[in-house]
Amino acid sequence: MKKKILIGIITLLIIIIAVAIGLYVGNSTVRLWTDKYILKKDIGEEDLPTIEIEEKDNIQAYAYSNYLATVGNNTLTIYNSSAKVVTSINVSITKPQFESAGRYLLVADQGGENLYLIYNDSLQWQKQMEGNISHICANDSGAVGVIITGTTYKSVIIMYDITGKEEFKTYLSTTIATDVAISNDSKYLSFVEIKTSGTVIESKVKTISVEKAKTTPRESIIYTYTTNSNSLILKIKYKKQKVVTYCDDGIHIFENGNDEKILTIDNKISFADITLDGYICSIAESEGNSILNSEYELKIQNVENKKESTYIIGSTVKNLYCNNGIIAVSLGNEVEFVNTNGWLAKKFTSIQNIKDITIGEKVAGIIYKNRIEVLTL
């Protein structure tokens, strides 16, 4: 008898849990109520640890992994998720440029010569380049790519390994490189090449075999991609062996010499991004909107299987920020942090205007003129 009662109770609990999950997943009203009152996803500025900054110091901030880094007055300061200083590193940087991958943070003096690679909160190596740094990239293995200008060549592309040892250099005499990315396994480096000498600007993505670049440099470029529509290529990012490519007319996947367009960017799309790990996202006004009721759809697409998730936004979007597996949708004084499943992770509300947002894997920085608030994701 007791066994039957126990089985009945367990069965009832399973049914209740299944119904609750079904309502949460399938009913947006239930999900919003649960997020706010049960899961406590709504956060206010008074709830967050704060880093005080001086507006006159022109402090620049960047979140990576579970840290937040600031650069100002030739000092790189790294904070933890509680806004406590972990370490400070002397640097020579006027205009910081940041890139990150996993636990690695790459910081360069944009237009200058100095480059620094950080792992967690420790300086791995630093270099003074011969030329001006225009673009940088890193991968999860600590490999680094740099585009240099201001030499006898229009662009020089350099790759370094995790120790800072140079892997190879590629020189461009008549064209310029505008972006660079390294595959997860460090076997390939791709770059965007722009030709401006003709009547029409031409853009291509070229993929270099790192092994061939070290042994037979003349044979190192194994793929050259141009879009079918000859659109302008703006940005690239690797997902395994796929080169995810942001163009002015859409987002393409380049792989093994093939071009697949997975998103068309038209006047209906107000924002799009490829910075997420393995996903792309876009924001467009929902169909059937009226003057009194405006909704926007955030669509998140997996670049491997093309599966798509949708998150509904209830007001006008001011800006979009993406990194790792988190999307931040800025609505002015409110920010909705959404994961790649299309679910709300956190909702932040401020009484002041937000200047900027930076997102790491586990933390985000809400940037104001005089302070940075650190939000744990």
Where are these regions (language model features)?
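Structural motif
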Residues: 26-28, 75-77, 113-117, 152-158, ...
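Repeated scaffold domains used in trafficking and secretory/extracellular systems
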Residues: 53-62, 91-103, 131-140, 174-184, ...
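Intrinsically disordered, low-complexity segments enriched in Gly and acidic/Ser/Thr residues
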Residues: 254-349
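Non-cytosolic head/periplasmic domains of membrane-anchored proteins
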Residues: 87-192, 199
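Hydrophobic beta-strand positions that form the internal "hydrophobic ladder"
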Residues: 68, 105, 143-145, 186-189, ...
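Sequence/structural signature of beta-propeller modules
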Residues: 1-50, 55-56, 377
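A short beta-strand motif characteristic of beta-propeller blades
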Residues: 41-53, 82-90, 121-128, 165-171, ...
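Acidic, serine/threonine- and glycine-rich low-complexity intrinsically disordered segments
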Residues: 178-291, 297-299
